Amino acid sequence: MIKDNILKIREDNEKVVVVGNRKNYYGKHVFDSRPNKKFIREFNNYTTLKQHFLGWIIKTKEKKINKKSFVFMDYRIKDKSSTAFTYVLPFKKNKALIEHTYFSKNECEKNVYEKYLMEYIEKFLKISDYEIIESESGVIPMTSYPFYKDSSKKITK
């Protein structure tokens, strides 16, 4: 892993140069996730939401998980406060990641995610005996700001 402060990014006909404090980095294409001054200045003019989630990797004694069936954006669990969905990423017949995700302005308390995860596992996966072997959570900021307008052929914002 490289740790450096990026001072600027410039491109020419053949390459992109990422100018760092320690050294320069070169590539054919660069993904630049730094917010620009225009975005910061106009932040309040755009819709902003958070995608926030809690996921559990569960292990079951019985082989009840369909390892060939990925469940994406299942909206059957309803939370009237905002848009939410659950997804299932199976690893084995007895092991899967189940994650409950929201799109909203504010995050939830941990017990809200847990309630809906337990409900989904029992009601839709029909699993009552399981062990949580790993947990993950996160918050991803989202906006309607048109970053693509700040992109070029070799730099994606």
Task: Write out the residue ranges for each language-model feature.
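Oxyanion-binding "anion nests"
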Residues: 136-157
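Predominantly flavin-linked oxidoreductase catalytic cores and closely associated redox partners
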Residues: 2-128, 143-150
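Short secondary-structure junctions
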Residues: 128-135
